[in-house]
């Protein structure tokens, strides 16, 4: 009877352990099973936030902790247990939970590079760090950053994202940016759309975007964007 009771308790324990929700993983730890479109869109959404830390804005800052170097003032990056965004899922199309990013803690330049390279190819990451070499800086091994950003594209009204599988190791993500400037340019206006096709490829280090654009990357020079006066 004792043996039966012990076996029953073990079975219940194992079942309880299997019933929990799986922990989210980073792109380079993503399962080798085929990605879904929603997985890829979630990867794009998280990668876009990371890309914008360099091109559009900056990481959260503690404005009470400042350092100066030359004419620049730096503030300590406050990015412990930072949650990266995912796209909104109205309704799951199957029983599998979509891929979601892990929370990240960024306290040094090395952490920042590691997080960026979780989503983007090393070449893209190198270019991002080169955009503004003085944007982020370690002081005594702790990450600081200058405050400010370039400001988002005023002409951007909205955008949509769609993913398509090319083969087992390659997806494309098509981002459609919509323009509308009537609210601040009337009676003139700029309307239309532009598209960017991004590549997500399975590399030796996991899934990485090998091409990318800013989250507000509307191309006002595109043939499908029109200006009326």
Model-derived features: where do they sit?
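Bacterial signal peptide processing site
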Residues: 19-22
């Amino acid at each position: 009877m004792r043996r039966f009771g012990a076996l029953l308790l073990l079975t219940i324990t194992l079942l309880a352990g299997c019933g929990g929700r799986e922990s989210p993983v980073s792109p380079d730890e993503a399962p080798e099973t085929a990605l879904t479109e929603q997985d890829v869109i979630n990867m794009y959404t998280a990668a876009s936030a990371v890309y914008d830390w360099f091109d559009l804005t900056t990481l959260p800052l503690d404005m009470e902790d400042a350092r100066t170097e030359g004419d620049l003032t730096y503030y300590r990056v406050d990015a412990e247990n930072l949650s990266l965004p995912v796209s909104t899922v109205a309704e799951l199309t199957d029983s599998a939970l979509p891929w979601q990013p892990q929370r990240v803690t960024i306290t040094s330049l090395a952490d920042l590079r590691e997080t960026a390279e979780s989503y983007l190819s090393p070449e893209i990451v190198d270019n991002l760090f080169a955009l503004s070499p003085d944007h982020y800086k370690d002081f005594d091994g702790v990450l600081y950053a200058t405050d400010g950003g370039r400001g988002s594209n005023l002409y951007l009204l909205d955008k949509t994202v769609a993913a398509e599988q090319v083969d087992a190791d390659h997806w494309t993500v098509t981002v459609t940016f919509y323009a509308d400037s009537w609210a601040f340019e009337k009676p003139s206006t700029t309307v239309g759309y532009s598209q960017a096709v991004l590549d997500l490829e399975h590399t030796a280090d996991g899934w990485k975007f090998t091409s990318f654009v800013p989250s507000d990357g509307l191309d006002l020079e595109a043939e499908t964007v029109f200006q009326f006066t």
